[in-house]
Amino acid sequence: MDGSDSLLKSVDVSKLDNGSTISFRAREDGFLESISSSSGKLVDMVLDSTSKECLPKFSFQNKLDFYFLFSDRVLQLQKERKVLVLIHCESLQSFDSFFAQKLKYADLISSDNVHEIFLPDSNAANIRYHWEWSPPSGKLLEYECKNYSCIAVYSTEDCTLERISKFSYYTVSRCGDSMDDTFFSESQRVTSPLTTSQTVQTQPPQSPEAKTELSLINTKTVIFPENYEDGPSFRSMLHELEQKSSLMKYYCKKIMKRIVQLSDAYDASQVAVMKLSETLSEASNSTSMNMDILLDSYLTKAMDIHATFIQKLNYDLINLLYEPFHNIYSSFIKPIDDRRLEFDEQSKSFYGSLSRYLSAKKDKKGGDSKFFQKEKTFALQRYDYYCFMQDLHDGSIINDINGIFLQYFHRQYDHIALFSNLMNSVLPNLQQLNLKLEKTKWSTTRRDKGREMHRSQVIQTSGRPKSMAPPSPSPISPSFPLHEIQSPMPNRRMAASADDISQTSNFTTEIKGKCISNGGSASPDKIFKEGLLLVFGATELGTDLAMVSKAAWHKHWIVVENGSLWEYANWKDSVKSNVSSISLKHASADKVRKQGRRFCFEVVTPKLKRLYQATSAEEMDSWIEAICEAAKISSFQLSRVATPLSASVRRPSKVFPLFSTSFETTPISRKLSGSGIKKAFSRKGSWNLQQFFRSDNSGTMHMEQLERYHASANIFIQMLRKTDVSNSVCADCGSVKDVTWCSINIPVVLCIECSGIHRSLGTHISKTRSLLLDSLSQQSKVLLCKIGNAAVNRVYEKGLSNPSLKPKPEHNAQVKLAFAQKKYVEHAFIDFAGVDADATLLEGLEQNKISKILLGLAAKPNFEENGVVFLKAVTRDTSKLHLLELLFMNGLLLPDSEQLSEHVSPDMQSYLSQKQFTKYLKE
């Protein structure tokens, strides 16, 4: 590609082992050339025998970061239906194979060597993209390889790749140790044959005082001769020093690696200390962990001191130890091999000149002077190399290294001393907190002893525990004149009878249980009682209570207040709490006799009957009296409108604040005649299912109708699963639990959690229905049976290359929501290559191919212009009415009556008119 058409401008490579960054510029021929290095050094190059190119050498520790700078022309690729990809291979043959054949988009992207480049929408002239290169897993140590990479443009129309810029490089791992601890044998670590123990014994014996002196330089194995003339002894000494130099180079690299690891540990420790402090503060504010005093008095200050101490240690470790040591290593230790090779070449050159000089028969003009000059030069070179090796093992270099470490440890000692002084300054606060904790432990010990005493009393007490016994009776005085009351409900245990009316206004009645009556005007909210009762399930009524299973009884929290009886289901879980109410106006309560269960009583209202079971006989009587008293007050305050519970009701005192105050009252849909009330309250009508649930003008179903509808829905679900096994599991997450929901416009069967996620996407994306609770049309049912989850997923998940991207049932809602948005909103997994929405949909409707119909609908066909064509293709055959339902659910609207009559038969027009869809609004 020409340079003017190049989309790539430059490439920056960072995270090299020396911390530098190398920049490359895109040339006109499509290759890259090095333009700069942050270290100021030349880039190492390696000759590739395969491609005959010089590759830049990148030394890394764990990974490399590539930053590509593109021009703004890359944003036009999407409009041209082109994709920008990065191809990376370790062999030239694999690299060339991508350009030697045509690959489909799915096959190209599924390759591990291809990375699709997603660029953000931006108006900037230059767009930056980051790619992280890392070696294969398990090959980090001693990993060296050639890498062939390029930026290419893939055309989805003709399935071809066009290369923009190619960049090849050679990577070398510096993370692992290149030498093993056993690389040098013991024979290589001792003196050479020419400097054996016999030579050492010629030295004068050391005095006892000299033996106790400590030296920072170890010279026991090397004797530096005063005469540095070339010879076997000199060469043996050099050979020994060269071996020790290689070992020194190895350990210097290892020391620098350990320093870097310690620095990383310091960074991680500092972050961990700060996060611990933040977490403790959050826990103190959000939970009952009262740590504010500890944080304010000691912990915050101590952790700040600790974090500052670690930060200073890390700073000195890098600036006072690593960088100076690395400079010495780079300047003197790393080029050891180069200096050795240079000396070998110089020695070889000199002795070659010596041979030529001695082979000459006679003295040529100037021959002696030239040789003598070479001899002098070689002597200086030999002396310089000797001094270099001496300094390396017994001179200034060793002194510099020891000085660096001594300076660092002196500074470390100063930091530790300062840290100790600062921690001593906050020690009194810690001691005071310890005293407060001892006092708290003493009070806690007293409380624990009281608990043990109470527990012992409960164990020793015979009979029922106090917590389960009914509360002591408390008298309640009605706060309104009872001589004005006339009871309309004979033969029931109401709170007032004919004898009660003749009594004086200071009449008192005794109600057992937790009942509260406040002074003031007569009002239903003067009666308040709450407690736990067992409620008999409505679907089990009409049978002998002794023969009913325990599952028919449910533990509800019951509250009597404001003239209503409130039932709290799932009262232990405030999140899932359900509340229902029963109006006590014209209600009565009485014991249920001749039943196998104890302590049962019934509540009868003009609308329903309800059966309850108390925990004792006294508790049952208390509830009956409380309900009767509340019913009596409610029945004779008809002129007053009861205050809604959501505005004035008290919460249940024993469960506060678990429940919401927004409750749904029980509606009375029609008036009841006197005979109707009498029939509802008669003993003969007790537990009659038809009397218990009465249908009214509002469309309330009979219980039998509800049961029949529920059974029919279950039959349809079983048929749906037998038709297609994939309908037994959720189409999105694969769950098999509560798979009783569906989306009628996609159409798929879902679990209850994924149905909520579909509902959050909006009805324009997914129209969610319940297979148990909602009424589905016949065509919607046929649609679900004939398509199913498998057919939909073959279209909507065709491009899902990695099955692990699909959520599992145990994943949280955020993961499932993100997948649903990609699948149904973005259509990220649908292959739209070469798809014409209108043509594909029409072909699918005519050939009755579900996959093409779903693909055409996902591609968003033009219903406004071609709606009549689609309608005509479906209405020709009445067996395709379920497909017509699918089109309606996805946006197809009916045309006007004139157009409809031209293409549709009269019978079909009558059918379509029942759909009542909106006509097109033409401008």
From Swiss-Prot:
A zinc finger (C4-type) spans 730-754. Keywords: Cytoplasm, GTPase activation, Metal-binding, Phosphoprotein, Zinc, Zinc-finger. Residues 444-455 have a biased composition (Basic and acidic residues). CDD domains: ArfGap, BAR_ArfGAP_fungi. It is found in: Cytoplasm; Cell tip. The modification Phosphoserine is found at S207. Its main location: cytoplasm. This is Probable ribosylation factor GTPase-activating protein cnt6. It comes from Schizosaccharomyces pombe (strain 972 / ATCC 24843) (Fission yeast).
